[in-house]
Regions:
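Metal-coordinating catalytic core of metallo-dependent amide/deamination hydrolases
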Residues: 1-114
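Active-site-adjacent C-terminal substructures of enzyme catalytic domains
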Residues: 103-174
Length: 174
């Protein structure tokens, strides 16, 4: 049995700009946490969502994932409101933003990915990024159903997740 723990870092909320000094301190903190990695527990890096991460932070997370040979976990396109928020502040969707920044690749675990279109599915597949499906949380919050069949048809790897306690009464994925 194996699992992963994610250290989430956030440096903004949509539209308020980033905090470069905070971004610079992330590696020092993550390197300390990463030392706790074992054969059974991997340590991932991430941000709670596109809304809580500046472009600078998204690029920094990718750099750290490469350096530490780990994954980046991030909530994307969970609900239509998250997609619309990203469009308002960044003039694009979350998946397109990651692609435009040049960070969308095999290191990225895209949590939820409910409100994505066929072109985004193709980009996810081409990048070999993964989607983490959280059906219980998605049902509780009413954000919709991820396009699992379309993702599967595109050969995207789909994992099963529980989301967080704030969006789910349990972290039991079964």
């Amino acid at each position: 049995l194996q699992g992963a723990v994610t250290c989430f870092y956030n440096d903004q909320w949509e539209g308020y700009g980033d905090a470069p000094a905070f971004t610079q301190a992330i590696e020092e903190h993550f390197s300390t946490i990463y030392q706790k990695k074992t054969d059974q527990i991997d340590i991932h890096i991430g941000s709670a969502s596109i809304e809580s991460a500046s472009n600078r932070l998204l690029i920094a997370l990718q750099s750290l994932a490469e350096k530490y040979q780990t994954k980046v976990n991030i909530h994307v396109s969970e609900g239509i409101s998250a997609v619309e928020s990203c469009k308002r502040s960044r003039q694009t969707t979350p998946i397109r933003l990651l692609a435009q920044l040049g960070v969308l690749n095999e290191n990225w675990n895209l949590i939820h990915a409910v409100n994505i279109d066929q072109e985004e599915i193709e980009w996810i597949a081409k990048a070999d990024a993964k989607v983490i499906h959280c059906p219980v949380s998605n049902a509780k919050t009413g954000v919709g159903i991820a396009p699992i069949l379309a993702l599967e048809a595109a050969n995207v790897t789909i994992g099963l997740g529980s989301d967080a306690c704030s969006n789910n009464n349990t972290n039991n994925i079964l």
